[in-house]
Amino acid sequence: MNSPDEHNGRRRFLQFSAAALASAAASPSLWAFSKIQPIEDPLKDYPYRDWEDLYRKEWTWDSVGVMTHSNGCVAGCAWNVFVKNGIPMREEQISKYPQLPGIPDMNPRGCQKGAVYCSWSKQPDHIKWPLKRVGERGERKWKRISWDEALTEIADKIIDTTVKRGPGNIYIPKRPFAVITNTAYTRMTKLLGAISPDATSMTGDLYTGIQTVRVPASTVSTFDDWFTSDLILMWHKNPIVTRIPDAHFLMEARYNGARLVNISADYNPSSIHSDLFVPVTSGTDSHLAAALVNVLIAGKHYKADYLKEQTALPFLVRTDNGKFLREKDFKADGSDQVFYVWDTKAGKAVLAPGSMGSKDKTLKLGTIDPALEGNFETHGIKVTTVFERLKAEITPYTPEATQATTGVHPSVVRQLAGWIAECKALRILDGYNNQKHFDGFQCGRLKILILTLIGHHGTTGSIDTTFEGWRLEGNSELGTVKGKPGRSVSAVLAQWVWGEQYQRSKDYFNDAQLREELGFGVDEMESMRKESEANGWMPNWQSIKEPVVSITGGINMFATSNGYQHLRDNFLKRCELNVVVDFRLNSGAMYADIVLPAAENTEKLDIRETSVTRFIHAFGQPVKPMYERKTDWQIMVALAAKIQERAKARGIARVDDPEIKSGIDFDKIYDEFTMNGKVVTDEQAVRFVMDNSKALGPGTYEEVMKNGFVAVGPSAGKTGPVPKDKPYRPFTVNVTDKKPYGTLTGRLQFYVDHDWFQRLGATVPKPQYRGGVLGPKKYPFVRNSPHARWGVHSFARTEQWMLRHQRGEPDVRMSPKAMAAKGIKDGDMVRIFNDSGEFFAVVKAMPALPDNMLFTEHGWEQYQYKNMTHYNMVSSELINPLELVGGYGHIKYTSGGFNPNRIFYETTVDVEKA
């Protein structure tokens, strides 16, 4: 029964409702849409409707600017950014790229990570103002401080460290993919005499094996050149997932008649678009490549004339000691950089032109007809050719002999070799996976040998590794300080020492197993590292300096590196002030002492150069930096100003730096950084780079900031000119103009007679050991960390829309068969572990994986894992001694080119339900 109160309440509600309806009917401004009005002109006479106008205004903008996205991505894509009330609201691809004749256009460029950037930039993990740690490192307890407080503390610590400990104890790792942003740290490193690590080796992305063959190793065609190929090998490359802006060129090439081949341990998404899938066992790719070379040579599927001119395969090698026959063998004052070939016309050994020591800087042979094959004698010295040595050492690697190692049936190898032999334009898309295996060094040499044997290198084909970047003289000048070279080191070696990774690897790997497979163990790797440093082959700064002050710019150092927790703890005990500059609180920032807020991509004024397209792209700064953020250039300018101010106040001027024949001028470091006021602002810095680069020049700044992109001129190519009417392809001038390569022999060099290469049996490209994963066999799974679809490294890994397109948390992937054997179901939380560490993740069934493989897509942050673990907490690494070699012509320490690569895909693990 209803109570009186309930009855009265209902009656009052009805009364008020009736009154409200009556009032609305009487008011001309309320419920106007319900009135019946005569409409004579349907286009003009409809009443104005306020509620509809809300939607109209939602799609109006105060301004539209241009930008690209750079953090870890090599693509280069132009976007419009729509701004309202000073806030970037959304972005849209710019589809105005010009089309080359006969080539599909690049419109539009972009991916889903770029499309959500404006949304992601507003999330709470993006930094608004300077922060200082108030708890223990890693506790994530902060207080807000002013820029002046932050810069003063950093400046004083830099000065104190340099004065008390000596120059070279400042460490500045960086890897932001934008010209001015990156160069800001480079310039500061030079002025402080600081240590700068090779960030490419830190991530395991060097192509050191290929660097022994050509210089530079890291080169690509512009990706529209894929369309011109008729055979494309995607070797541990998954462009459908990782090259979203460019994958259409593969599909268009296929429609144009090209064959696509996917070579991978897993049946990845690119495999379904392939004409042939080659399932190679993890860590055995060099054996597969050797089998292909074996078939090509045995069937004489090679271009002899090309090999005679473009390669060192006809060069003579002594049979007594395995060394090149050199001019110094016959003359007391002869060069050790001048070599011989056997001239079949003259019937004798003659000097080959084009080498480093040759006066004739050309590959033109003139009347010389070098012998590719044969055994000869000259002046009492028995010699043979490099090609003969190669044939002899590659003979055992037949498709039948390698099947047990690679898991690839001989018929598949022969089918693929046949396609290679008959194709007109071979393209090898060389992914980042192989280089992270011990097998990767020799495999790189073998891959480029395949391309070279059929005469496609620098002609109709290419082996595309990673982008080389365009030649911008202005950028080089901005990053150079006369008389102040700074200190460059291998990131792997720096972390091997400071992070005590040597001990971690020694504890993890089975020494007896390594000695059986490789002939040496971790102790020998360490002794060879020390020997290399003592010989001056590799820089030794990590052995004589400490990272007392670390300023990390745009790189997630611990999460990026092997042995996360081991590196972190040992590095931080050496580091007294850890500064992180980034636009968000990533895993590395958790352990910072001071965090400086860098500008978002929408807040930058900068340019992006990447040679996968013929364009420079703009960060057009659609909005000014919000809150208290600053661009990286402005942060370094402000730091330089504060150092100079504090030095003058403390009466400190110059500190000599005799180790690098330089000095640090603290009292004028701001003047030096800004070139006495020429490059104070971001715009001044960008204009300086563009105006002083031949491939761009005056006027291009306005063009790139208006359109979002600008085409580079012919001189931008580092290995040849950029044509106006067709895609760029590297190393063409070596074929067309007979220009020597930057190698010791001046040619594509497939023989290295360095003592260490001889000792390790690696003079020619061939497998370095029996193949397979080198991790302890007591753990049944090999762990790989492929690039992800829903993030670019850690970029966008926390973005809400990207998380909704996947499991929303870190996962590991296993084959259903392996899961069943472990009693694990899809969606279970599992523990992945070995002697080095553990991490937890949700398991996801992936039938495309081999039963012994475990995938953990990289880029996840530590704080996204259960118990604050991380996938790199189980990894350990090895050093390939071949990558420690130096003092041999072109084979020497080169940042971004040649130094020890991160080899950590030899890690094995086990899995159990958590």
UniProtKB/Swiss-Prot annotation:
Terminal reductase that allows anaerobic growth on chlorate as the sole respiratory oxidant. Binds 1 [4Fe-4S] cluster. This is Chlorate reductase subunit alpha. Mo-bis(molybdopterin guanine dinucleotide) binds at residue 205. Pfam families: Molybdopterin, Molydop_binding. InterPro entries: Asp_de-COase-like_dom_sf, DMSO_Rdtase_II_Mopterin_su, MopB_CT_Nitrate-R-NarG-like, MoPterin_dinucl-bd_dom, Mopterin_OxRdtase, Mopterin_OxRdtase_4Fe-4S_dom, Prok_Mopterin_Oxidored, TAT_signal. Belongs to the prokaryotic molybdopterin-containing oxidoreductase family. One of its GO terms (cellular component) is periplasmic space. It comes from Ideonella dechloratans.
